[in-house]
């Protein structure tokens, strides 16, 4: 029997998924059913672009609901130890990119919560793996997507 994937999330990430699931079921599903009803009222469904679009949206909504429900059945909440001095899920980390002489603060999260545009990096990303378990003052080398080496110093963990 295959083992199920366990999804590591912070409490915040779990709350966001639950909120998204509620929104999909209580708002998006209802809106989509109304759109389907309106499209059906237009007549011939064989060449009805509105109907096709509504059906595609319905499939997307239902797939996301199933995905979230599966995640919620296999979730492991990662509780951050505030006394911990090492990088792990749930921690905020101030990194100094030596070659660029630039400081950037990231929130280290589970894969599902990752959102690089909002400075949330997955612990399983190349950067996340490189800094996991490290402490303030540690210097790590990371390889960029273009295979360029960079030195990163951990300046703060909170």
From Swiss-Prot:
Keyword Transmembrane: no
Entry keyword set: Coiled coil, DNA-binding, Transcription, Transcription regulation
Highest taxon of the lineage: Bacteria
Coiled-coil region(s): 14-76
Signal peptide stretch: none
PROSITE patterns named in the record: GREAB_1
Gene3D superfamilies to which the protein is assigned, alphabetical: Transcription elongation factor, GreA/GreB, C-terminal domain (3.10.50.30), Transcription elongation factor, GreA/GreB, N-terminal domain (1.10.287.180)
Residue ranges of the TM segments: none
GO BP, one annotated term: regulation of DNA-templated transcription elongation
GO molecular function: DNA binding; RNA polymerase binding
Pfam families, sorted: GreA_GreB (PF01272), GreA_GreB_N (PF03449)
NCBIfam families found in the cross-reference section: greA (TIGR01462), PRK00226.1-4 (NF001263)
Family: Belongs to the GreA/GreB family.
UniProt function note: Necessary for efficient RNA polymerase transcription elongation past template-encoded arresting sites. The arresting sites in DNA have the property of trapping a certain fraction of elongating RNA polymerases that pass through, resulting in locked ternary complexes. Cleavage of the nascent transcript by cleavage factors such as GreA or GreB allows the resumption of elongation from the new 3'terminus. GreA releases sequences of 2 to 3 nucleotides.
Protein name as catalogued: Transcription elongation factor GreA
Origin organism lineage: Bacteria, Bacillati, Mycoplasmatota, Mollicutes, Acholeplasmatales
